[in-house]
Amino acid sequence: MTLRVIDVSANQGLIQIAPIDCDAVIVKGTGGDNYVNDCCDFVLQQCFKLNKPAGLYHYAHEFGNINDPVVESNFFIDNCKFYFGKVLVALDYEVAINGRNYTQQDVDWCYNFIQNVIKRTGVVPLLYISKSLISECDWSKVANANVGLWYAQYADNNHTGWLSDPWDDGKATNPFTTVMHQYTGHGRINGYNGDLDLSLFYGDVNAWNKYANSHDKPISNGGDNVNSNDYLTAFAKDVLAGKYGNGAERKEKIYQAVQNKVNELSK
Protein backbone atom coordinates (compact mmCIF):
# COMPACT_ATOMS: atom_id res chain seq x y z
CA MET A 1 0.00 0.00 0.00
CA THR A 2 1.29 3.46 -0.88
CA LEU A 3 0.02 7.02 -0.65
CA ARG A 4 0.57 9.56 -3.41
CA VAL A 5 1.97 12.67 -1.78
CA ILE A 6 2.54 16.23 -2.96
CA ASP A 7 4.64 18.72 -1.04
CA VAL A 8 4.10 22.45 -1.43
CA SER A 9 5.47 25.76 -0.19
CA ALA A 10 4.75 29.44 -0.65
CA ASN A 11 5.71 28.92 -4.30
CA GLN A 12 2.27 27.38 -4.82
CA GLY A 13 0.58 30.20 -2.89
CA LEU A 14 -3.04 29.65 -1.84
CA ILE A 15 -3.27 26.36 -3.67
CA GLN A 16 -6.67 24.64 -3.72
CA ILE A 17 -6.28 21.06 -2.52
CA ALA A 18 -9.72 19.56 -3.24
CA PRO A 19 -9.33 19.34 -7.05
CA ILE A 20 -5.85 17.81 -6.92
CA ASP A 21 -5.42 14.09 -7.55
CA CYS A 22 -3.37 13.14 -4.49
CA ASP A 23 -3.72 11.13 -1.29
CA ALA A 24 -1.73 13.34 1.09
CA VAL A 25 -0.16 16.79 1.29
CA ILE A 26 2.98 18.04 3.03
CA VAL A 27 3.45 21.79 3.35
CA LYS A 28 6.43 23.92 4.31
CA GLY A 29 5.85 25.52 7.69
CA THR A 30 9.06 27.32 8.54
CA GLY A 31 12.66 27.83 7.46
CA GLY A 32 15.79 28.79 9.35
CA ASP A 33 15.14 30.93 12.40
CA ASN A 34 12.95 33.64 10.86
CA TYR A 35 10.86 32.39 7.93
CA VAL A 36 7.20 31.42 8.28
CA ASN A 37 5.13 30.29 5.31
CA ASP A 38 2.01 32.47 5.41
CA CYS A 39 0.16 29.96 3.21
CA CYS A 40 0.76 27.00 5.52
CA ASP A 41 -2.38 27.21 7.63
CA PHE A 42 -4.54 27.83 4.55
CA VAL A 43 -3.34 24.53 3.05
CA LEU A 44 -3.51 22.50 6.26
CA GLN A 45 -7.03 23.64 7.12
CA GLN A 46 -8.17 22.40 3.72
CA CYS A 47 -6.56 19.02 4.40
CA PHE A 48 -8.28 18.76 7.78
CA LYS A 49 -11.65 19.63 6.23
CA LEU A 50 -11.12 17.07 3.45
CA ASN A 51 -9.92 14.46 5.97
CA LYS A 52 -6.76 14.14 3.88
CA PRO A 53 -3.48 13.08 5.55
CA ALA A 54 -1.27 16.12 6.03
CA GLY A 55 2.34 16.86 6.85
CA LEU A 56 4.52 19.78 7.78
CA TYR A 57 8.22 20.40 7.21
CA HIS A 58 10.97 22.78 8.32
CA TYR A 59 13.65 23.83 5.83
CA ALA A 60 17.05 24.00 7.51
CA HIS A 61 19.43 26.92 6.93
CA GLU A 62 16.89 29.09 5.08
CA PHE A 63 18.58 31.74 2.89
CA GLY A 64 21.92 30.00 3.53
CA ASN A 65 22.06 31.16 7.15
CA ILE A 66 23.64 28.54 9.39
CA ASN A 67 21.97 28.62 12.79
CA ASP A 68 22.12 26.55 15.93
CA PRO A 69 19.93 23.44 15.49
CA VAL A 70 18.09 23.97 18.77
CA VAL A 71 17.32 27.56 17.79
CA GLU A 72 15.84 26.39 14.48
CA SER A 73 13.88 23.53 16.00
CA ASN A 74 12.44 25.83 18.67
CA PHE A 75 11.42 28.27 15.95
CA PHE A 76 9.71 25.43 14.06
CA ILE A 77 7.88 24.17 17.14
CA ASP A 78 6.86 27.59 18.45
CA ASN A 79 5.35 28.60 15.12
CA CYS A 80 3.68 25.27 14.35
CA LYS A 81 2.80 23.84 17.77
CA PHE A 82 -0.93 23.75 17.10
CA TYR A 83 -0.38 21.16 14.35
CA PHE A 84 1.83 18.69 16.22
CA GLY A 85 -0.07 15.47 16.82
CA LYS A 86 -2.28 16.09 13.79
CA VAL A 87 0.27 16.00 10.97
CA LEU A 88 3.40 14.13 10.02
CA VAL A 89 6.46 16.35 10.50
CA ALA A 90 9.82 16.37 8.74
CA LEU A 91 13.17 18.12 8.67
CA ASP A 92 14.20 19.15 5.14
CA TYR A 93 18.01 19.21 5.06
CA GLU A 94 19.61 20.37 1.82
CA VAL A 95 22.27 23.01 2.59
CA ALA A 96 25.69 21.82 3.80
CA ILE A 97 27.09 23.72 6.75
CA ASN A 98 30.41 24.36 5.02
CA GLY A 99 28.66 25.35 1.80
CA ARG A 100 30.35 22.61 -0.24
CA ASN A 101 30.15 19.00 0.91
CA TYR A 102 28.32 17.19 3.68
CA THR A 103 30.23 16.06 6.76
CA GLN A 104 29.54 14.60 10.19
CA GLN A 105 28.90 18.17 11.30
CA ASP A 106 25.72 18.07 9.20
CA VAL A 107 24.72 14.75 10.74
CA ASP A 108 25.22 16.19 14.22
CA TRP A 109 23.13 19.24 13.29
CA CYS A 110 20.23 17.07 12.12
CA TYR A 111 20.50 14.86 15.18
CA ASN A 112 20.39 17.81 17.59
CA PHE A 113 17.47 19.41 15.74
CA ILE A 114 15.49 16.17 15.84
CA GLN A 115 16.35 15.42 19.46
CA ASN A 116 15.02 18.80 20.52
CA VAL A 117 11.78 18.20 18.61
CA ILE A 118 11.42 14.82 20.32
CA LYS A 119 12.23 16.33 23.73
CA ARG A 120 9.70 19.12 23.41
CA THR A 121 6.88 17.36 21.56
CA GLY A 122 7.42 13.61 21.68
CA VAL A 123 7.07 13.56 17.88
CA VAL A 124 9.80 11.87 15.86
CA PRO A 125 10.26 13.78 12.58
CA LEU A 126 11.19 12.23 9.28
CA LEU A 127 14.45 13.35 7.69
CA TYR A 128 14.32 14.56 4.08
CA ILE A 129 17.67 14.40 2.25
CA SER A 130 19.02 13.55 -1.17
CA LYS A 131 19.65 9.82 -1.39
CA SER A 132 23.25 10.47 -2.41
CA LEU A 133 23.97 11.90 1.05
CA ILE A 134 23.32 8.60 2.79
CA SER A 135 26.65 7.13 1.68
CA GLU A 136 28.61 10.35 2.29
CA CYS A 137 28.27 10.31 6.08
CA ASP A 138 27.53 8.00 8.99
CA TRP A 139 23.87 8.61 9.80
CA SER A 140 23.59 5.86 12.43
CA LYS A 141 22.94 8.19 15.38
CA VAL A 142 20.03 9.78 13.52
CA ALA A 143 18.56 6.49 12.31
CA ASN A 144 18.93 4.98 15.79
CA ALA A 145 16.55 7.65 17.09
CA ASN A 146 13.83 5.87 15.06
CA VAL A 147 13.94 8.59 12.41
CA GLY A 148 12.36 7.50 9.14
CA LEU A 149 13.85 8.50 5.79
CA TRP A 150 12.16 10.62 3.15
CA TYR A 151 14.67 10.72 0.33
CA ALA A 152 14.84 12.52 -2.99
CA GLN A 153 16.10 10.80 -6.11
CA TYR A 154 15.00 11.66 -9.63
CA ALA A 155 15.39 9.72 -12.86
CA ASP A 156 15.52 12.99 -14.83
CA ASN A 157 13.97 16.45 -14.93
CA ASN A 158 11.21 15.57 -17.38
CA HIS A 159 7.56 16.05 -16.56
CA THR A 160 5.91 12.95 -15.14
CA GLY A 161 2.76 11.93 -13.30
CA TRP A 162 1.99 9.40 -10.61
CA LEU A 163 4.16 6.28 -10.84
CA SER A 164 3.66 3.12 -8.82
CA ASP A 165 7.32 2.10 -9.11
CA PRO A 166 9.48 5.16 -9.86
CA TRP A 167 13.13 4.84 -10.82
CA ASP A 168 15.64 4.32 -8.04
CA ASP A 169 19.36 3.53 -8.25
CA GLY A 170 18.80 0.37 -6.21
CA LYS A 171 21.35 1.26 -3.54
CA ALA A 172 20.46 0.47 0.06
CA THR A 173 19.29 3.22 2.39
CA ASN A 174 20.89 1.67 5.49
CA PRO A 175 20.92 2.57 8.33
CA PHE A 176 17.55 4.19 7.65
CA THR A 177 14.14 2.69 7.15
CA THR A 178 12.70 4.26 4.01
CA VAL A 179 9.33 5.89 4.57
CA MET A 180 8.93 8.02 1.47
CA HIS A 181 10.57 8.61 -1.93
CA GLN A 182 10.31 11.96 -3.70
CA TYR A 183 10.86 11.00 -7.32
CA THR A 184 10.28 14.22 -9.24
CA GLY A 185 10.20 17.96 -8.86
CA HIS A 186 8.37 18.29 -12.17
CA GLY A 187 5.20 16.36 -11.47
CA ARG A 188 2.13 17.04 -13.55
CA ILE A 189 -1.13 15.67 -12.17
CA ASN A 190 -4.84 16.34 -12.53
CA GLY A 191 -6.18 19.33 -10.64
CA TYR A 192 -3.15 21.62 -10.77
CA ASN A 193 -1.70 23.51 -13.71
CA GLY A 194 1.99 23.50 -12.93
CA ASP A 195 4.91 21.53 -11.53
CA LEU A 196 4.61 19.77 -8.18
CA ASP A 197 6.96 17.62 -6.12
CA LEU A 198 5.64 14.05 -6.11
CA SER A 199 6.46 11.38 -3.55
CA LEU A 200 5.32 7.88 -2.68
CA PHE A 201 4.70 7.12 1.00
CA TYR A 202 5.26 3.42 1.72
CA GLY A 203 2.29 2.72 3.94
CA ASP A 204 -1.40 3.38 4.38
CA VAL A 205 -3.30 6.12 6.20
CA ASN A 206 -2.95 4.29 9.51
CA ALA A 207 0.83 4.21 9.10
CA TRP A 208 0.83 7.92 8.26
CA ASN A 209 -1.22 8.68 11.36
CA LYS A 210 1.20 6.75 13.55
CA TYR A 211 3.98 9.10 12.48
CA ALA A 212 1.71 12.08 13.07
CA ASN A 213 0.41 10.90 16.44
CA SER A 214 3.66 9.64 17.90
CA HIS A 215 3.73 12.27 20.64
CA ASP A 216 2.52 11.40 24.10
CA LYS A 217 2.93 14.66 26.02
CA PRO A 218 1.99 18.33 25.78
CA ILE A 219 4.37 20.52 23.84
CA SER A 220 6.80 22.26 26.16
CA ASN A 221 8.37 25.68 25.81
CA GLY A 222 11.79 24.25 26.56
CA GLY A 223 11.00 23.97 30.28
CA ASP A 224 7.53 23.60 31.71
CA ASN A 225 4.65 22.33 29.62
CA VAL A 226 2.68 24.99 27.81
CA ASN A 227 -0.68 25.80 29.42
CA SER A 228 -3.65 27.64 27.97
CA ASN A 229 -2.26 31.03 28.98
CA ASP A 230 0.94 30.26 27.10
CA TYR A 231 -1.06 29.44 23.99
CA LEU A 232 -3.02 32.67 24.31
CA THR A 233 0.21 34.61 24.76
CA ALA A 234 1.72 32.96 21.69
CA PHE A 235 -1.44 33.68 19.74
CA ALA A 236 -1.43 37.33 20.84
CA LYS A 237 2.23 37.67 19.86
CA ASP A 238 1.37 36.37 16.38
CA VAL A 239 -1.36 39.01 16.14
CA LEU A 240 1.03 41.75 17.23
CA ALA A 241 3.59 40.51 14.72
CA GLY A 242 1.08 41.14 11.96
CA LYS A 243 0.50 37.51 11.00
CA TYR A 244 -3.26 38.11 10.99
CA GLY A 245 -3.21 41.44 9.17
CA ASN A 246 -4.96 44.56 10.41
CA GLY A 247 -8.46 45.98 10.85
CA ALA A 248 -11.30 43.98 9.34
CA GLU A 249 -8.87 41.46 7.85
CA ARG A 250 -7.43 40.76 11.32
CA LYS A 251 -10.88 40.28 12.84
CA GLU A 252 -11.89 37.88 10.09
CA LYS A 253 -8.69 35.82 10.30
CA ILE A 254 -8.82 35.58 14.10
CA TYR A 255 -12.49 34.61 13.98
CA GLN A 256 -11.77 32.00 11.31
CA ALA A 257 -8.83 30.53 13.24
CA VAL A 258 -10.98 30.11 16.36
CA GLN A 259 -13.97 28.81 14.39
CA ASN A 260 -11.79 26.23 12.64
CA LYS A 261 -10.72 24.92 16.03
CA VAL A 262 -14.33 24.88 17.30
CA ASN A 263 -15.42 22.94 14.21
CA GLU A 264 -12.58 20.49 14.67
CA LEU A 265 -13.35 19.83 18.34
CA SER A 266 -17.07 19.44 17.69
CA LYS A 267 -16.62 16.58 15.22
Across the structure, where does each feature detected by a protein language model lie?
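Short secondary-structure boundary/hinge segments and terminal tails
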Residues: N65-I66, S135-E136, S266
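Flexible, glycine-rich phosphate/dinucleotide-binding loops
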Residues: D33-N34, F63, I134, N158, ...
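Extracytoplasmic Gram-positive cell-surface binding/anchoring modules and repeats
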Residues: L240-K251
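Functionally critical loop-and-helix segments that line ligand-binding/catalytic clefts
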Residues: M1-P19, V142-N227
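Repeat-associated, polar segments at repeat-unit boundaries in modular proteins
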Residues: Y255-K267
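Substrate-binding cleft of extracellular glycoside hydrolase catalytic domains
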Residues: M1-V123
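Primarily a LysM-type cell-wall glycan-binding module
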Residues: Y231-A241
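Catalytic domains of cell-wall/extracellular-matrix polysaccharide-remodeling enzymes
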Residues: V87-D168
